[in-house]
Amino acid sequence: MSHQLTFADSEFSSKRRQTRKEIFLSRMEQILPWQNMVEVIEPFYPKAGNGRRPYPLETMLRIHCMQHWYNLSDGAMEDALYEIASMRLFARLSLDSALPDRTTIMNFRHLLEQHQLARQLFKTINRWLAEAGVMMTQGTLVDATIIEAPSSTKNKEQQRDPEMHQTKKGNQWHFGMKAHIGVDAKSGLTHSLVTTAANEHDLNQLGNLLHGEEQFVSADAGYQGAPQREELAEVDVDWLIAERPGKVRTLKQHPRKNKTAINIEYMKASIRARVEHPFRIIKRQFGFVKARYKGLLKNDNQLAMLFTLANLFRADQMIRQWERSH
């Protein structure tokens, strides 16, 4: 497919002021290792045969990335390609040829789900970041967040998603799933991801969030009791787990007497604060707030892609911070 600009596209590209969307897409264009990502999907992507010629794999991958960055459904992504020139240019498409429709966009997503390729992309990108010296292994921060799913029964099956469950946090009930993550303490990059129903206890997945090379593990009070767990008995690390809020409140009643213990809690909090960065990126930057699909597998595929892109977004932030300080 030729990547030629139409008159409208060329007029757009010659205007002076860059929009925020253009600047963002330009940064992502440069940071994403496209060839590495294409190689993961290529063995599974349809080859050109006697039928309709498929769109270039990289074009479909670029569209898939934009869907996650802007939290767009398949239909909204199709509309955006027609309406927004910067997104068309990023996908290497132009208005003088056919643009992928929502079914084509959906089929690409189904291909990734079917072969669990988002998980492979997550591993590939993390290996690439580790080889580049961005991701370290000294410490792991662990955390989990509840992701709400539609709780209405007003659908075709007249029931809620059976793979999602309800759980109570504080005084509030939530229905949905949980994303458990292990984050590199130095860079704030996510190295492990496990998805479960929302009623899964955070501690049950802790072992699956460790890579085995860390010297310390940092977590909030929800992970109290980790060192005593049978499956974690062989894990030789320093456990930096926050005390329960009630105990911290008791310590603060006698600040002078408990000064050291209080300072240790502040130190633990400052270390684990970085675990919030990946969640903040996917929720605030990418606009992900609710499970879009039915079943854990489809949502796991979306979350694996979101955390892959969040790691690359974070790597870009780190590069720009370094450039500003030099």
Swiss-Prot record:
It comes from the Bacteria. One of its GO terms (cellular component) is cytosol. Pfam families: DDE_Tnp_1, DUF772. One of its GO terms (biological process) is DNA transposition. GO terms for molecular function: DNA binding; transposase activity. InterPro entries: Transpos_IS5, Transposase_11, Transposase_InsH_N. Keywords: DNA recombination, DNA-binding, Transposable element, Transposition. Belongs to the transposase 11 family. Involved in the transposition of the insertion sequence IS5. This is Transposase InsH for insertion sequence element IS5U.
